[in-house]
């Protein structure tokens, strides 16, 4: 008579262990015992009056072809509220959806798009923008450098930038140091898209003016990563080159853009940047964190930037706020790191960018 192992006495277990070492004496088999008990809902269904009438649940082409298959029979009602399996169709990454929308806004506002490489020279990233070669932002703790150098652009532009740094232009004194051409050749991952604006300004001719340009692309900084900072981010860039442009126009462009992006609360505060004067910081209200979120800077480019690149000083409105922070409020994201964490569930369920 088979015995259950759990019911054996200690001495029986000892005997079993000894006999298991001998072949053909003990046979152990494993069986699964399942106890089933009807639930309260099941009991209600059993006691209810369920019709045994045959009903058609699906209407198929085969059923419709034969009148005898459906005539005189009943069709089961469709329950429009019953749960169905979720279907996740293919779609663009939600950050890319927002980036495309940002491009659409600038285009509708009459701007032309600028593009540029993510790897650029220190000349275009810093020197052309009147950032001194001993400025802290150029140190390795802020910028990702590449262990290679590149050639410099047209000698005329290089000479003009060098003089701007060493002696100044239009009455300024510059930075009063010896500008190093070799330092300007260093390659780096661009920390901002303003280098694209610098290249664009240098390529313009008199007949191209007035003009409005924008860029929206990836930037990289050696930042301490937290909920509002990342080492990789999108930035939206803009320049307006117009002899009649003024500071009020600058604020107007920015207000219009961020309102179209869905922000009602926008404010500006005075700021300092090496290549603009006057300068402002742009802030929008983050409804989830209940704080004013700083997006970046804007201002009118200094003569030390415009004269070397354009040949003369013309008012150039310029801005370069971070774009990823703009998305946080719409997607109810509390941490910038959530934008790129490769969470499949998030990518499937997050809403489309619709404004």
Task: List each model region and its residues.
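Short amphipathic alpha-helical interaction segments
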Residues: 5-22, 27-28
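TRNA-recognition modules of translation machinery and tRNA-sensing kinases, especially anticodon-binding
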Residues: 32-355
């Amino acid at each position: 008579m088979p015995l259950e192992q759990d019911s054996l006495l200690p001495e029986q277990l000892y005997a079993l262990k000894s006999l298991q070492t001998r072949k053909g004496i003990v046979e152990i088999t494993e069986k699964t015992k399942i106890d089933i008990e009807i639930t309260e809902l099941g009991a209600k269904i059993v006691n209810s009056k369920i019709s045994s009438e045959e009903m058609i649940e699906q209407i198929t082409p085969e059923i419709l072809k034969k009148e005898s298959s459906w005539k005189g029979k009943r069709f089961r009602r469709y329950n429009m509220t019953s749960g169905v399996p979720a279907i996740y169709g293919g779609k663009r990454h939600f950050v890319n959806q927002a980036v495309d929308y940002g491009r659409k806004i600038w285009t509708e506002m009459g701007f032309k798009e600028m593009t540029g490489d993510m790897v650029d020279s220190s000349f275009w990233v810093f020197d052309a923008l009147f950032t001194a070669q001993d400025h802290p932002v150029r140190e390795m703790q802020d910028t990702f450098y590449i262990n290679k150098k590149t050639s410099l652009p047209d000698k005329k532009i290089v000479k003009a930038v060098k003089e701007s740094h060493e002696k100044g232009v239009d009455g300024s004194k510059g930075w009063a140091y010896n500008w190093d051409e070799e330092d300007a050749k260093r390659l780096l991952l661009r920390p901002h898209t303003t280098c694209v604006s610098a290249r664009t300004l240098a390529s313009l001719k008199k007949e191209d003016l007035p003009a409005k340009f924008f860029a929206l692309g990836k930037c990289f900084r050696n930042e301490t990563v937290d909920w509002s900072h990342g080492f990789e981010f999108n930035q939206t860039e803009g320049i307006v080159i117009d002899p009649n442009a003024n500071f009020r126009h600058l604020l107007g462009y920015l207000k219009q853009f961020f309102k179209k992006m869905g922000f009602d609360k926008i404010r500006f505060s005075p700021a300092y940047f090496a290549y603009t004067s006057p300068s402002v910081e742009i802030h929008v209200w983050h409804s989830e964190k209940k704080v004013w979120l700083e997006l970046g800077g804007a201002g009118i480019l200094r003569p030390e930037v415009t004269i070397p690149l354009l040949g003369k000083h013309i008012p150039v409105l310029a801005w370069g706020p971070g774009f990823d922070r703009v998305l946080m409020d719409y997607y109810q994201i509390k941490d910038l790191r959530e934008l790129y964490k490769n969470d499949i569930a998030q990518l499937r369920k997050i809403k489309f960018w619709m404004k």
